[in-house]
Amino acid sequence: MALKWTTVLLIQLSFYFSSGSCGKVLVWAAEYSLWMNMKTILKELVQRGHEVTVLASSASILFDPNDSSTLKLEVYPTSLTKTEFENIIMQLVKRLSEIQKDTFWLPFSQEQEILWAINDIIRNFCKDVVSNKKLMKKLQESRFDIVFADAYLPCGELLAELFNIPFVYSHSFSPGYSFERHSGGFIFPPSYVPVVMSKLSDQMTFMERVKNMLYVLYFDFWFQIFNMKKWDQFYSEVLGRPTTLSETMRKADIWLMRNSWNFKFPHPFLPNVDFVGGLHCKPAKPLPKEMEEFVQSSGENGVVVFSLGSMVSNMTEERANVIATALAKIPQKVLWRFDGNKPDALGLNTRLYKWIPQNDLLGHPKTRAFITHGGANGIYEAIYHGIPMVGIPLFFDQPDNIAHMKAKGAAVRVDFNTMSSTDLLNALKTVINDPSYKENIMKLSRIQHDQPVKPLDRAVFWIEFVMRHKGAKHLRVAAHNLTWFQYHSLDVIGFLLACVATVLFIITKCCLFCFWKFARKGKKGKRD
């Protein structure tokens, strides 16, 4: 009997302590690959007993209001329908994929217009939330402990400011590292850290460093200034005081960067930054029966996995046939994620799928190569499982991601718009038959696995840490409180130069005075 009551008491105590450590997390939702990373973290938070509420628009592409998942959805109405929103995104993606990238400035200016269009949509979503008094009252009364958001899609920091609670960012990159540098205080010396979207490596020639500096200036004085004006005005109106987006973002307690040093080029970082790249990666699960049979039928030659991501749903008939012709000439079997009309040149060794279990395929022992658009999620999965890549980058950070892998000897790049079947065929033969590519990717894989704490556990730790301590201001550097000229010590340099100039002026005056005195005395002596 005593044992029975002891057991009951222990169970009650466990519930007491568990509930005491649980927190309430408000999430400003993202879409596509951004959401896939966030969802991995959120599900782990739920597993640990936290209450997670995801703020999603009625036009959201990835959320189903009727989904009975462990994540609580708070759907807010917006003027766009789901179909309209998806069509807009697909049109923007189509425009991005058609941008000619062989000129110096044109790709940036065209991508900038598209990014501004996306920003306008996100800002309207944000307005729909903060102007919804009933929803805001409900959220206020819920007494959340923290806001979790992606820095690429502003609004989460505004909600945190309105509710007076700390917030944590999940982030990959912003064009030109604008948010990271101006809002996060990140340090990216242009002498050896290439600007994102520049396609440069950290081993730059003099002219490449000149090019990199021009990119920095472009993003600082054009993209940053003109893109932020609307956000600054909107935040000032909502908060009832003059402010800026950057000023609000600077209050972030922790930045969880979805990068790692085996992928990105090294650079300095701050105390409130942790790198959790590859947090979504996991061991491969068994494949569906039909797919496993097809993979096993490849024999010793193995298989090639081909995917251009979730945002590219179709391609021209001409490009599809160029690719199909190349794939038909390799001895490997090919699993191609493709949502379009079957190419006429499709070989017997290639099967088309509207969806593939990419992580599980990359982790299969028969996989020999991965043809990818260069999305960060896919690259991390390839690194995790040690699969060399052929990169066909399309837009945004994808050319940079492939440039990183190429610099590390783990990938070959081909251009989607100009490649021939021979180009793709030769690239595949290189990464499959040249053992150096497998060796290099396996080295990166070993580094990815050799971490004292898994990236996902670190990400969850920092969110829980901020909830426990009501923030992490002790990790926030004082640089956030300085103006740009104070940060670069221009006021100090100016003061010291003024001091030197004053001393030189006094010395010069003294010398002139002495010279005048001696000259006068000499003239007087001559007259005597």
UniProtKB/Swiss-Prot annotation:
GO cellular component: endoplasmic reticulum membrane
UniProt membrane topology term: Single-pass membrane protein
InterPro entries: UDP-glycosyltransferase, UDP_glucos_trans, UDP_glycos_trans_CS
GO molecular function: UDP-glycosyltransferase activity
Signal peptide from the UniProt entry: 1-23
Reactions performed catalytically: glucuronate acceptor + UDP-alpha-D-glucuronate = acceptor beta-D-glucuronoside + UDP + H(+)
PROSITE patterns: UDPGT
Pfam entry (one): UDPGT
Transmembrane helix as UniProt keyword: yes
Gene Ontology biological-process annotations: estrogen metabolic process; lipid metabolic process
PTM sites of type N6-succinyllysine: K134
Keyword Nucleus: no
Residue runs in coiled coils: none
Residues with attached carbohydrate: N66, N314, N481
Entry keyword set: Endoplasmic reticulum, Glycoprotein, Glycosyltransferase, Membrane, Microsome, Signal, Transferase, Transmembrane, Transmembrane helix
EC number(s) reported in the record: 2.4.1.17
Protein name: UDP-glucuronosyltransferase 2B10
Organism annotation: Homo sapiens
Taxonomic lineage from the root: Eukaryota, Metazoa, Chordata, Craniata, Vertebrata
